[in-house]
A protein has these predicted regions:
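An extracytoplasmic/periplasmic, membrane-proximal ligand-sensing/linker region
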Residues: 36-38, 181, 221, 268-329
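N-terminal secretory signal peptides
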Residues: 1-28
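A ligand-binding cleft/hinge motif common to bilobed small-molecule-binding domains
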Residues: 104-113, 179-181, 208-241
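Hinge/capping helix and adjacent helix->loop/strand transition within the periplasmic-binding protein
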Residues: 89-95, 109-196, 245, 250, ...
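N-terminal (or domain-start) structured segment
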Residues: 30-120, 159-161, 184-212, 300, ...
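Beta->alpha turn/N-cap motifs
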Residues: 99-104, 164, 194, 211-216, ...
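Residue-level signal for nonpolar/aromatic packing positions in well-ordered secondary structure
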Residues: 39-41, 48, 55, 72, ...
Length: 329
């Protein structure tokens, strides 16, 4: 290479470096200016539920932080597919993001009819925590813990069943994971919500159920139901008296998480700004108390850690799921 060519190459490298530097400064500037207009927070569930309440807590706090309105838009239907698709199709500029949950991972593992690719079309922002999910039984059920339940199920294969609040929920996956890891055959009975499930359990129509602790708590306190274990990998700080199923089956974890995601392709600086602000809100005493009152454990994760968590969930759930292969109603 002669001196002229070497000089020309050096100028190209300098120009490339200058362009990259300008691009980086532009992205940082965009993140600092964000948001420049009202922000839409999509919730793929109907108004009034736990996800809707949680979204509105964060929307109010972020609105005060940004001095911009944050509008919660409920888009239920299709087993959260409608709201998730609307998020995936939005402009990746940070002005539309969503509060999603375990159904994102479960649908990706179970369903073949999704109009989006959860791993490719969405960008995780931050996980905020998860609902404590419990395995409950009627007070006079013949097992008082998971170890005794496994022994009972092995002695009487295929005779015990567990209830959940529906197909494709974290409660169903918790039961299927228990089957998978313990080598037992509990039959799944899906319910349309938890109210009828509790009635049937108390009435001895079904012996076991997985549910969110906060919704079962009144029945547990009254002595009508008892807790055999929680589905998180360790005891819940909200309910430390209840053992984790993982104490009997190491590695067991099937949580009903809550976190925020945006359309894929969002500038990393904007993702970082969103994550920083969401996690800052999460760290405030008022929000932490509101989440505890809802039975949600604070378990924060930033974008990279959250993405790795979702991918790990998809792999684990794919191992144990029976594909639905049909659209949700």
């Amino acid at each position: 290479m002669n001196a002229h060519e070497d000089g020309r190459l050096s100028r190209r490298r300098l120009l490339q470096a200058a362009l990259l530097g300008a691009l980086a400064r532009t992205r940082v500037a965009h993140a600092q200016e964000f948001p420049t207009r009202p922000v839409k927070l999509i919730v793929p569930q109907p108004p009034g539920g736990a996800a809707d309440r949680l979204a509105r807590i964060f929307a109010q706090a972020l609105e005060a932080r940004w001095k911009q309105s944050v509008v919660v838009e409920n888009k239920p239907g299709g087993g959260v597919v409608i709201g998730t698709l609307a998020t995936a199709r939005a402009a990746p500029d940070g002005h539309t993001f969503a509060l999603l949950g375990s159904s994102l991972s479960i649908n990706a593992a179970q369903r073949k009819d999704l109009p989006y690719d959860a791993a490719r079309d969405l960008g995780p922002i931050a996980r905020v925590g998860y609902f404590t999910v419990v395995l409950v039984a009627p007070a006079d059920f013949g097992a008082d813990n998971v170890r005794e339940l496994i022994a009972m199920a092995r002695k009487n294969p295929g005779t015990l069943s567990f209830a959940s609040n529906g197909i494709g929920t974290s409660a169903q996956l918790a039961g299927e994971m228990l089957n998978h890891m313990a080598g037992i055959q509990l039959q799944h009975v899906p319910y349309n919500g938890a109210a009828k499930m509790y009635t049937d359990m108390i009435g001895k129509q079904i012996p076991l159920g997985f549910s969110v602790a906060s919704s079962a708590e009144s029945f547990i306190r009254s002595g009508q139901l008892k807790v055999l274990g929680v589905t998180s990998k360790e005891r819940s700080p909200l309910y430390p008296q209840w053992p984790a199923i993982a104490e009997t089956l190491p590695g067991f974890e099937a949580v009903n998480w809550a976190g925020f995601a945006a359309p894929a392709g969002m500038p990393r600086a904007v993702t970082a700004r969103l994550a920083d602000d969401i996690l800052a809100v999460l760290a405030t005493a008022d929000v932490a108390k509101a989440m505890a009152d809802m039975g949600i454990e604070v378990r924060p994760q930033g974008p990279d850690e959250f993405q790795a968590f979702i991918q790990s969930e998809m792999r684990r759930f794919a191992e144990i799921s029976r594909p639905l292969n049909k659209p949700s109603n």
